[in-house]
C-alpha cells in the first residue's frame, strides 16, 4: 500500500515512495492559515520558532 499526499495545490496529489508513510503540511509561524509546503515524509519534523508541521497518515489528509 502506498500513501497518497496532496501537493501544494490541493487539486493535485502524488503517490508517496515506499517508506514515506506520512503526509505533511508546513506553515510559517507568521501565517498559520496558508501552507507553504505539502507532501510525503517519513518522520514528522519538530516544530520550530519559525515553522509548524502538521502530519497525518491517511490518503490526502494534508
UniProtKB/Swiss-Prot annotation:
Protein keywords: Cardiotoxin, Cytolysis, Disulfide bond, Membrane, Secreted, Signal, Target cell membrane, Target membrane, Toxin
CDD domains membership: TFP_snake_toxin
Domain of life of the native organism: Eukaryota
Tissue expression as described in the entry: Expressed by the venom gland.
Keyword Membrane: yes
InterPro entries in the record: Cytotoxin_Cobra, Snake_3FTx, Snake_toxin-like_sf, Snake_toxin_con_site, Toxin_cobra-type
GO MF entries: toxin activity
Gene Ontology CC annotations of this record: extracellular region; membrane; other organism cell membrane
Disulfide bonds: 5-23, 16-40, 44-55, 56-61
Entries under SUPFAM superfamilies matching the protein: Snake toxin-like
One of the GO BP terms on file: killing of cells of another organism
Record-stated family: Belongs to the three-finger toxin family. Short-chain subfamily. Type IA cytotoxin sub-subfamily.
Quaternary structure note: Monomer in solution; Homodimer and oligomer in the presence of negatively charged lipids forming a pore with a size ranging between 20 and 30 Angstroms.
Function: Shows cytolytic activity on many different cells by forming pore in lipid membranes. In vivo, increases heart rate or kills the animal by cardiac arrest. In addition, it binds to heparin with high affinity, interacts with Kv channel-interacting protein 1 (KCNIP1) in a calcium-independent manner, and binds to integrin alpha-V/beta-3 (ITGAV/ITGB3) with moderate affinity.
Protein name: Cytotoxin 7
Organism whose genome encodes this protein: Naja sputatrix
